[in-house]
Amino acid sequence: MKSLIRLRMSSHDAHYGGNLVDGARMLQLFGDVATELLIQLDGDEGLFKAYDSVEFMAPVFAGDYIEAEGEIVNVGNSSRKMVFEARKVIVPRPDISDSAADVLAEPIVVCRATGTCVTPKDKQRGKK
């Protein structure tokens, strides 16, 4: 089971000089993806228990379009193991004009993570 969301990083997301977006924003996106996956599987938002690994691989800037994708790779009694990847798919081109942007021929992986979510048994309403 997979989920994908795509959104534009705004100037509000920029946290550091040079319009750099805080890496924690990618984790927030992964949390949203995980919530959708849990709703699809269990009919409940569940809880994010822990990240097992997080790797930041490339910078993200205001104006970048990011795809965040997640997949449930293992289903336990109440735990759900997930893998996540965030990719930059569109970048602004301020060198051309204030409103120019390019769709990347090859997306740039900006973050990868693995984690575990939990849906308590008494809240699971998914298909059995």
Swiss-Prot record:
Catalytic activity reported: (3S)-3-aminobutanoyl-CoA = (2E)-butenoyl-CoA + NH4(+)
Keyword annotations from UniProtKB, A to Z: Lyase
EC identifiers of the protein: 4.3.1.14
One function term, GO molecular function aspect: 3-aminobutyryl-CoA ammonia-lyase activity
SUPFAM superfamilies: Thioesterase/thiol ester dehydrase-isomerase (SSF54637)
PROSITE patterns recorded: HOTDOG_ACOT
Claim: Lyase is one of the keywords in the record: yes
Residue span(s) of domain HotDog ACOT-type: 1-123
GO biological process per UniProt: L-lysine catabolic process to acetate
Gene3D superfamilies reported for this sequence: Hotdog Thioesterase
Cell division among keywords: no
Superkingdom, natural source: Bacteria
Record pathway: Amino-acid degradation; L-lysine degradation via acetate pathway
InterPro entries assigned: HOTDOG_ACOT (IPR033120), HotDog_dom_sf (IPR029069), Thioestr_dom (IPR006683)
Purpose of the protein: Involved in the anaerobic fermentation of lysine. Catalyzes the deamination of L-3-aminobutyryl-CoA to produce crotonoyl-CoA.
Quaternary structure and partners: Homohexamer.
Family recorded in the similarity comment: Belongs to the KAL family.
Name this polypeptide is given: 3-aminobutyryl-CoA ammonia lyase
Gene name of the encoded protein: kal
